[in-house]
Amino acid sequence: MQLHILNNPKDAALAADAEFLKQSLFNLLHEEASPLVVETVKLLSTSDDSAALIEKVLPQLDERQTYDLTLACGLFAQILNIAEDVHHERRRQIHEDAGHNAAEGSLTETVRRLKAGKADGKSVQRQLDNTSVTAVLTAHPTEVQRQTVLNFNRRIRALLPQRERCTNADALARLRREIDTVLLGLWQTSETRRHKLSVNDEINNGVSIFPMSFFEALPKLYRKMEHDFQTAYPDVRVPNILKIGGWIGGDRDGNPFVSGETLRFAFRRHADAVFRFYRSELDKLYRELPLSIRRVKVNDDVMALAALSPDEEIARTEEPYRRAIAYIMARAMGKARSLGLGMGCKFGFLEPYASAQKFLDDLKKLQRSLIDNGSRLLAEGRLADLIRSVSVFGFHMMPLDLRQHAGKHADVVAELFQHAGLEDYNSLNEEQKQAALLRELGHQRPLYSPFITYSDHTRRELAIFNEARKIKDEFGEDAVTQSIISNCEQPGDLLALALLLKESGLLAVENGKPHSRINIVPLFETIEALENACPVMETMFRLDWYDALLESRGNIQEIMLGYSDSNKDGGYVTSSWCLHQAELGLVELFKKYDVRMRLFHGRGGSVGRGGGPSYQAILAQPAGSVAGQIRITEQGEVITAKYADPGNAQRNLETLVAATLEASILPDKKDPDAKLMQALSDVSFKYYRELITHPDFIDYFLQTSPIQEIATLNLGSRPASRKTLARIQDLRAIPWVFSWMQNRLMLPAWYGFGSAVETLCEGSPETLAALRGHAQNNPFFQAMLSNMEQVMAKTDITLAENYAGLSESPEKAKVIFGMIKEEYRRSRKALLDLLQTEELLRDNRSLARSLALRIPYLNALNGLQVAMLKRLRKEPDNPHALLMVHLTINGVAQGLRNTG
């Protein structure tokens, strides 16, 4: 392990942690692996060309040794991740304890900037009242690690900070033994899934984050928000500006296994988790509030609750708060029982709360009484946190969005029209479709009849909307609030969804005006769709019917923007610019029609799917596009990295809120030169499309990446492609990006950029100067280049050439790889020119250090992957080769800390 990289005194503790874990892993290898494997791993730690070392050693290894070597390299990546996570937390705590200036991206710093920017309390309160930030957890299959493996990692992460606190050799030896024990369990556990995840598995995985993290992190973060704001603005109150949302169980786009049943299962699991949390917190409150009426006064409304209490122990006669809490718990658990949840209550069950608000009202009575009668500290502790939790989580824990492809909605509408004796919907042009849909939306009568036999597809689609209606009735109105139309291209796509909502009782016409219980959200995802977003929405805003519908939803229109497909469609530069342009256009359009806009950013974990640091990404949004309202998807390995630990979760959510407030209240940002950016986009698009439309490109991609093996990894419940793969557009964006990361090209995040810069700057020093100026001063361009720099630092063209050797047509591969290699050279040169530096990551020491530590094991895993792919292509039925490929895919993803 290249610990000489950690020569900065600030990294001394990281070096010690890494060495400590390394020694534990070597202890394990000496016991569990052959001497040849142990020696090879030791050589890798100091090798300058670990892929070449693997190529030399591999012929000497049998199947068991190959497995052990691959697993060992992957485990080194995992323990380095853990050591770095612990170190980040350590440095943050040291920074905070030393009283240094608040870090960028913290709420403390944001509030300081607001105060320095002369924002007064009224304007801050107004902004907070109009702020809504949601991190939306999705089931997109990008988490390669099993939950079992993640649990082992969490145990090591919890143990490692104890190393610094060990004061003698015996304590250190005990800690060593504990970590050795966890590592042995990890070593003897299968790293890969043997069976495909079901939708219910994904739901359970998503729910598990809440008791592990969110139930603790959100109340703490709200408490910090209140402290930070009230320190600067004493009269400001913090409403519920931050929530967690989800898609898991309601996202049907491309997933035939999502249904009304999975939606119901999801909310039962949500409710089970949140009611167990409430029961636990109420039980703790019961123990913390034995206040006696001999010692304190108690408000009448709390005495009234106590009088209804099922807790009739004689010792409780003088303890009204405990009696009131027993009453509240019995009613809350009564609600849990009415929802079919099998959990008990030591006080029995009383009439269920009709809503989370009623539950909240009773808790607030306790708080008010404590404050009124001199017990403010007790009121502002656990009770305040529980009140905040109930107001945020309700009975549903997190809302789920519904999502389906526009074409699937259209199929249902067409069948409803057919059986109702109406016109042939599919034969209508767009204008005729709009007219027909508006006509039907104006009628009270439904099109659906229970006496007609419909196709399975239509029955399933209507069933999930009907289930959503029932869930809203049972779990609360906030349980399901959005229905997203993926691949939205025309106004008729929005009206078609509206008709399905009407057929399901989620949209009604009252006194000639529509009223919807769910937001209709178009998702614009391809380059063409992004360019057409404004015309589509302007058509909708001109409709009196839709204007009335928006009025019923608070005059807010949510728009979802797709980063993944637009990138696959046009490359990173063009995708980034088209998204920016679409947002600028939408800002002006919404102002024109006096509609409030909320943007929902469909970002992935990788740069090729819109990933990158959230703080910079939000601040780089066009002026006026945030305005306090933002939703962002979080998925797969991102959920694990950001939110599996309460401390990490709190900091990452704090960053989202801080960036949203800064972008909304301090929107003084320079728009990039539109003419210059458009020219850069056009040339980049040209070169990118030349590559992916090359007649030999698809075969090259399939043969020189593990795309087909990724499809067999059992990462998620939905298929890897929408149909038989014959074109790039048939492939989902996740495996597309995932594959390019595995073969170390990261192509979707930079291809075309170098040629664009070279073309524009040739003979034009003014253009070069302008681009350099943007690189220094423009948030949009800075974020683009920063993300590209991080990706190019992980790119290894030499390793990628080894993958090119997997092609069945060496001459054709030589042409395609030659194009890629030359564009990489140009893009790297252009990036360094614009950043005016001689090396990548010069200003990102943390990432440079992280990559340097991982490189020996990461490159070894790539070398193993190439060898195993070569073997698998020759022997397609070789189970060992397939297992090894799967194991290397896991390991490379861990080494890069990214998948798709």
UniProtKB/Swiss-Prot annotation:
It catalyses: oxaloacetate + phosphate = phosphoenolpyruvate + hydrogencarbonate. Pfam families: PEPcase (PF00311). One of its GO terms (molecular function) is phosphoenolpyruvate carboxylase activity. Keywords: Carbon dioxide fixation, Lyase, Magnesium. Gene3D superfamilies: Phosphoenolpyruvate/pyruvate domain (1.20.1440.90). One of its GO terms (cellular component) is cytosol. One of its GO terms (biological process) is carbon fixation. It comes from the Bacteria. The keyword Lyase applies. The active site is at H140, K568. Its cofactor is Mg(2+). Its EC number is 4.1.1.31. Belongs to the PEPCase type 1 family. HAMAP family: PEPcase_type1. Forms oxaloacetate, a four-carbon dicarboxylic acid source for the tricarboxylic acid cycle. This is Phosphoenolpyruvate carboxylase. It comes from Neisseria gonorrhoeae (strain ATCC 700825 / FA 1090).
